[in-house]
Every structure is written in structure tokens, then in C-alpha cells.
Amino acid sequence: MKNINPTQTSAWQALQKHFDEMKDVSLADLFAKDGDRFSKFSATFDDQMLVDFSKNRITEETLAKLQDLAKETDLAGAIKSMFSGEKINRTEDRAVLHVALRNRSNTPIMVDGKDVMPEVNAVLEKMKTFSEEIISGSWKGYTGKAITDVVNIGIGGSDLGPFMVTEALRPYKNHLNMHFVSNVDGTHIAEVLKKVNPETTLFLVASKTFTTQETMTNAHSARDWFLATAGDNKHVAKHFAALSTNGKAVGEFGIDTANMFEFWDWVGGRYSLWSAIGLSIILSVGYDNFVELLSGAHAMDKHFANTAPEKNLPVLLALIGIWYNNFFGAETEAILPYDQYMHRFAAYFQQGNMESNGKYVDRNGNAVDYQTGPIIWGEPGTNGQHAFYQLIHQGTKMVPCDFIAPATTHNALSDHHQKLLSNFFAQTEALAFGKARDVVEQEYRDLGKDPATLENVVPFKVFEGNRPTNSILLREITPFSLGALIALYEHKIFTQGAILNIFTFDQWGVELGKQLANRILPELGDDKDINSHDSSTNGLINRYKSWRA
């Protein structure tokens, strides 16, 4: 990958000039001038997904200039580098190949001269065999009973992805009850353990190194809880499996290494749900549905790798995001799924985006003088409408939004889905076009209100509009369409990182807090006051010691 400061390109300078021409242009005017705007600024993927980006503050000229930026920063070369197994994660000297995990074409993908696909397929086959034993009930616990509950113990990428997907695909789930434990706060695992029976519970310990503090603390507590009933250490092997690469530590824990599912250093944590980390997904919805998830992602991978940038959905969404973040000064993006099963989707891509592109140093090691990753947040509709949409509609901050909805629901109760979708359509229309003062005044006159009332109330009922949105309409949330949607966002994030000249696939920002926590932990073992930190940290620790039970 080339190291090009995007702000030093001629395309960036052209975009800055273009922004000065565009900053006061309204969406209402853009739509009024072009009756064909929707067809020009929308695209359908695989007859499964409609992406409408027409309600953005862009013109064809805007997109052309953004595409020039992609060309000048060699996005095409960056895409080829990732798919060909080059070590584009340079700070960790690793390839970035989550695309290999869902390579359903099974074409060779090389890392260090070796095709990784045979190993990928072998782990998938092992997961298939194991999951079929658990789901069928042929796998028995230490008292001869079949497994009824699965507890996934992990954190970050070992938790957020599997949890999001198992929730999103709940309509496809089998009889197994899924539980997820991530937080080192003992409350998290304590509450889960209240719901399960040691005789019929399987624990998945998801840690590549088998040393992650939060995960191993929870795993040891789960094992202690299990042994309090089971008694004999030999029973651990029937109730614990590992998603890891550290066979020695896994064996010492009591897990049979035959039930250790490996993945590789070219799989980043936040891109790992496609790997052995996705075992909880397979146990929840079955192997065939997991393969459909992989197939949907692979279809989007092929679209991303092979489609011209002018028609390339991840590229288009990425460029529009850069336009708002760096030229309009928008600091956040909201992801708003109108599907309750998708309630963890925004949280998943909060990590996916912010841990990937939350960097202030470029690929040359220099501090950047432009914006990199945005703040990502969101909640399902319509809940969000009654919480934070007020600020999006009438606040002082621009919040570009992605609205996501399925045309067909899994729960066709009465007219619920029509009401949900009427809100989905209405919100993007309201955000784009608003409500002008003269319209509000006329509404009040039609109600027979006197002029004094008009003056007191009308200013507060005006909606400026011109708030940008993307709408992503799926036929239905299926394993295939969900896989494609996740991959769409993954490649959007990669595209932005490539253009913005940052390393998307490391996460050094999580390390300093860990180091300091490891230094502080021994200081909490007694009741002595400490003075080894700044006055604030000393004061907090000493008050904690005096207050704790």
C-alpha cells in the first residue's frame, strides 16, 4: 500500500473548492432539479439489497471528485494488496485475510507462499462435525445428559460479532440456548450462571492467546462453578471447548485439544466472526446457515474486488463518509436498523469502525492534520426516534445516518411491520426535506390559531432538513443478506483507512490502559494508601480502598 497524505493530492484541493460551492446547496433543490435522482444515486446488490444514497448532499460532480481522490491515493492497489495476502498490517507484520475465511470459491489465497485455504477448510469441517454432535444431542455431558446451553466467553471481537449475529439470526436458531459473557465485572458471569445447569452447559473460551485477562478470569470462574458440582477435573473436557491457538495453555486448563478450534494471525479480532470465533453462531443456527452467512460475505467480497469504483457500494459509502467527516465537519455517523433482531448491529460496527480507524498517526508515522475515523453509534428504530432523533432533526450537529430495514419481517404480526417501515421511510424524508416556516404557519392558520400563537410556537416547529442519510433496504434478514451487509461495512471501513493513509488493522490504543491496569492491580491487594500516581488517580484508589466492603 502506498503512503499518500490525502490532503496533499490535487483531488483533495478540488474537493475543498467544490465544498465551498456545495455547502449551502439543499437536498430539496437537488431533487427538484433532477427527477431521476433516485435512479442515479442508488444501486441494487444481488437482488437482495437496495442501497439508496440519493438523500446525500452530493452531485455527480461530487462523486467524480471523490473518485479522483480514491484514484490518487491508489485505492485499487490497496484492495489488490489485501486480497493477495500482502502484509498490509505493517505494525504487526501481518496479512489481513478475513476474506479467506469466507472464500467459497476456494481459489488459492497465498500468505508467505502458502495457500491458506486447506487449513481454513479443515477448521470449518472440524466445526461442522463438533457442532453436529452438540446440536443432535449425541455429545453428552458428564452425567450423560445432552447439552442445552452454550456460554461463549470472550471479549471484543470474540464477543461482539458472534453476539450480534446470533441475535440477528434468532429466527433461524435451534433448541440450544445461547449466552455471552464478556465483561470482567463478575456480575456478568454470575447472572449467566444463575440461568444454566452444569450438567448440560457447554462453555466456549474464545481467546487466541488464552491469556486475555477478562476472558481467562471469566473462564476460571466458570470452571470453578462447574467443578463445584461436577467434582472431578476430568469432566471439564466434556463441558469446555477453546477457540484459540495456544494448545499448551488450553490443555493445562483441562480442555481436550481435540476440541480446540484454531485461527490465524491474519484474522483480526474485529473481523473474526467468520473464523472459529463463529462457533457459537454455528451452534445457534446450524452449520448450513453459517455457510450461507459466509456466502453472502463472499458475494460482497467479489463485488468489492471486481466492481468498478463508480458502481462499487463499499467504495461509494466510504467516499460519502469522508466527504462529511472531512469537509462538512461531521464527527459522528449513526447506524439505525429498523429490525429488532439487529439491535447489536450498531454496537458491532462501533468497534469495527472506531477500533479500526480511530488513529491520529498516518502510515508514515506522522500525526495527521485531517479527520480519520468517525464516532459510530445507534439504536434500533423506532426506539431511537423517541430518544435521540430530536438532535438529529433539530440540533446543531450534522449526523449522517444509515437507515437499514428488511422488506419482509420474520414476525408478521398484524400491521406491525407496515407501521415500522412507514417510520423508516418517513424519517429519511423528514431529515432530507424538513418543514419550512410557511408550511408550519399555514398548518396553524388552518387550525384557526391567532397570530400571537403563531409567533410563540412556529419557530420551534420548523425543520431545516438537509440532513443526509443512506437507506439500505434488504429483501429479508437472512444469513446470506446479513453476511453481505456485514462485509459491505467492513470494506467501507477498509476503503476509508486506505484513502486516509492510516493502518486500519492494528489497535494499539487498547494497550496503554491494559498496562496501567496490570500495574495498579497489585496495589489494590491491601488497605494501605498509595501515592505512586498523579493526585487524581491516588485519590480515587485510596477512596475505593476506604469504601470497599
From Swiss-Prot:
Keywords assigned: Cytoplasm, Gluconeogenesis, Glycolysis, Isomerase
EC numbers on record: 5.3.1.9
Described function: Catalyzes the reversible isomerization of glucose-6-phosphate to fructose-6-phosphate.
CDD domains: SIS_PGI_1, SIS_PGI_2
Main location per the UniProt record: cytoplasm
Protein's UniProt name: Glucose-6-phosphate isomerase
Subcellular location(s) of the protein: Cytoplasm
SUPFAM superfamilies: SIS domain
Catalytic activity: alpha-D-glucose 6-phosphate = beta-D-fructose 6-phosphate
GO cellular component: cytosol
Keyword Transmembrane found: no
Family statement: Belongs to the GPI family.
Pathway: Carbohydrate biosynthesis; gluconeogenesis; Carbohydrate degradation; glycolysis; D-glyceraldehyde 3-phosphate and glycerone phosphate from D-glucose: step 2/4
Example GO BP: gluconeogenesis
Keyword NADP applies: no
Annotated catalytic residues: E355, H386, K514
Domain of life: Bacteria
A GO molecular-function descriptor: glucose-6-phosphate isomerase activity
